Amino acid sequence: MRSLHDIAAPAKLNLFLHVTGRRADGYHLLQSAFMLLDWHDTLHFERRGDGALSREDRLTPLPENDLTLRAARALQEATGTTAGAHIAIEKRLPAEAGMGGGSSDAASCLLALNRLWDLHLPLSALEKIGLSLGADVPFFLRGRNAWVEGVGEQITPVTLPRARFAVVKPGRGLATKDIFASPALKRDCESATIAGFAAHPWDFGRNDLESVARKLCPEVGEAIEWLGSQDLRARMTGSGSAVFALLPPGKLLGRAPAHWAEDGWVVRECSNMEVHPLVGWAPSDDSV
């Protein structure tokens, strides 16, 4: 196999996010429900025989050492393969949004190169590599909506109804490290249960990061209030700055403020997905 094209890397929303503690090494303990969206980046891969890794940014310039290249390099180091790749990225997901765009790109890269390079690593091995890159990567590798705990490594699949969502991404982004470094962040939320979430998935819990985010980026509050003015219950996803709201059947969004487009805001209607397009691309441990 010489190439793989049109590889999707979908976004996620955190339906809720509770911070339940902090480990001695500084990592925060979380509980959350991750849901896949039909908004995605698109990746293309060409195999190289010289072992080199290169990247082409087709829509939006990315940092020189982004998660996609780091994922490819980590896979090379873990396996000792001499294969390389040229990776082209059509970046549509906004950065610093709390939607997992970089982590999703990394996961799709690991799955695609595992196939392109004929490595046949099981999913568990890819998850180990993925967790070293970012807490959200294992979720995207599993590829199903999930209840997530710990630092992102405890993943339990959940079934969610099909639904539409309004997503608003302010022009400003938020760095995850700034949110978690805030002394105002509460880190002692009581543990919740999957059963409690399953009974009311669309309005369960809250996002414990939201109050800190609104202070660092007032546009988060502006987006929530705009959705609220349309009788929609909005909250932030992940560490922001994107916010979202469930759209009831037949609900149409009103016109966004005129300055938003000029200031780089994005307003989009999305639907959730049951499974990631690449589910099954890595063998399970039982089949290896």
Language model regions located:
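Residue-level signal for inorganic ion chemistry
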Residues: 15, 43-45, 68, 102, ...
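ATP-binding N-lobe of GHMP and related small-molecule kinases
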Residues: 1-97, 115-124, 169-172
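Contiguous, small/hydrophobic- and glycine-enriched helical/loop subdomains that border
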Residues: 84, 106, 110-147
